[in-house]
Amino acid sequence: MPTRPGVDPGSRMNKRDLVIVTVMTLVYLAIALINLGSLEAPQTGWEPDRINESFVVDFGREVEIDRIFLFGGLGHAWGCFGTLEIMAWDGDEFVPYTFIDMKSIFRWLYTTDSVKTSKLLVRNTYLRAEKEEDRRYFKAEYREMAFFSGNELIRDFTVTDINSSQDVSLLFDEQDLVPDRPSFYYGTYFDEIYFPRTALEQIEKRSIIYENTHPPLGKTLLGIGIRVFGMNPFGWRIMGTLFGALMLPLMYLLGKRMFRDTFWAFFCTYLLMFDFMHFVQTRLATIDSYTAFFVMGTYLFMLDYYGAWAFERGFARSLVPLLLSGIFLGLGGATKWVALYSAFGLAVLFFASRVQEYIEYRRRLDAAIAQKKESPDSRGKLLRAYVLKYFVLTCLFCVLFFIIIPATIYTLSYLPIQDRNDGRNLVEEVIASIKHMYEYHKGVTEPHPYSSHWYEWPLMLRPMYYYSGPLMPEGMGSSIACLGNPLVWWTGFAAFLSMIWLLVTGRIKRILGPEESRRGWVPLVGYLSLYLPWVVAPRKLTFIYHYFSCVPFLILMIAAVMRYMEGIKLIGRRASYILMLSVLVLFILYYPVLSGLVAPRWYLNVLRILPRWDW
């Protein structure tokens, strides 16, 4: 049977493409690494075994203390929280002064209560907490403590054990690591209180892990940075940042496969490069970077399969992109369940491709018979052979690729935490974890000031406020907020609505051709597969960052609609350049609220252009 010559060479990467995407990735990475986090953090500390262990800090003179900093570590107890009660010497006795509650670790906590005294008595007590079940914790690891008089770090003092089973001097042995003020650069913020700690627990093979509401793979990947650079902010953020940078080559490949054009591949990558959420979310030590990366990968290979006829490639070669798509699906699901939503879209695209290809194969077969290149008697036999190989057998392989292999990857992702002393085998551990995670997410209903509903995300009606810098100079601020670049998200949502109309009415097919129209369904289906499940998801407390994996598909739809408008001469290439320039300008203007850069408070307020934008 005659076939068309090969796959469109325009979809292949050439030297020019490699240079472009390499430069873009390196430029982005250089920007993303600026002030990512400190390579140093306190490593030793005081870990009292009993309640009410205490020590005295003697300054040898009367000093005015107006700030006390405290950095907490993981210690050896799961409930590594507690409270330090601090009493001040008034000349006759120690009187109550202040408390520092350690409810989170690997960050600098502080009190600004002031006192004039020559000595302090510090005692560990049960954690002061609103919930009764939290008040039992006291086995904290206090890694470093510091005293300030004004902006000056007080260094001249002696420490005496009063009632302590551990070496208290370890609480004051890394004073050079004390920052002038606490900030994200020196410690955890937002959900980093969960994931880096859990990654360390997995590395140390702890019997109980802290964050158990998502599969382990994301924490395993995060832990690679900790293994290489240590338990410090740079160490726990670097892997997510690298995956964020690697999303750019994936975006370029998606654009290249989709449009067969270097400019549009560059255009798509550029928009992702300067999208706000991509920058913010991948610099945060959570697991969303890995999830979005794997979702992009699974759709890249499904696009590769969907965009070419399997019978032209040959049976064995046609299975390769399906295998790779399934592997990425498994990796995504082993990181965060939301990646599994993409399976709905993958199934739609796969079965649509089988129907479309059968129609195309039959059309070509009939043409070959009409040209007497095939015998009419062979028609039924050839069609049955096609269906057996390219539908039945391919579907059977898809059971392996999209069910068995992902399930295996998911199960194997639990190996790093299999050494826990709970008596369960690996499969039992996975099943118990799945039940626990489902019940947890179904039961998350407590209100949150920055939660938002699924229908608010495309218009960014309620961004997520991640970080507010404490102890800032008068009139200055430091903030990190999670939102999208307005020109990417708002234009993208308009492109999504336009794409539905253009595809359903066949306008893209008439202007850009049937192949581009066919591929145009990929970002639309991908977007809907990741977005619509949130309408019916059992989890009711949701946030705008749940929309992150949808962003690459919005960008592809922007490019598709602009290509169509160019095709009908409604706009020229200049419009794309103007959009790209405007996206960059907005990224620069909003950079302080994306990076935590200290800026005048009035400027940060000016950036709040919608009523519920708050930082």
Region spans (language model):
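Transmembrane helical bundles and short interhelical boundary loops of multi-pass, membrane-embedded
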Residues: 2-20, 30-57, 75, 90, ...
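Aromatic, loop-rich ligand-recognition surfaces of beta-strand-rich domains
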Residues: 33-187
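Aromatic-rich transmembrane-lumenal/periplasmic boundary elements in polytopic membrane proteins
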Residues: 152-200, 387, 406-456, 460, ...
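Transmembrane-helix motifs of polytopic, lipid-linked glycan transferases
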Residues: 234, 238-259, 297-301, 501, ...
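Short acidic/glycine- and proline-prone juxtamembrane loop motifs at membrane-interface regions
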Residues: 236, 240, 277-291, 338
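Transmembrane-helix signature of polytopic, membrane-embedded enzymes
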Residues: 251-274, 293, 312-320
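Short helix- or helix-capping micro-motifs
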Residues: 268-273, 300, 329, 333
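Membrane-interface transmembrane helices that cradle and orient dolichyl/undecaprenyl
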Residues: 298-321, 332, 351-360
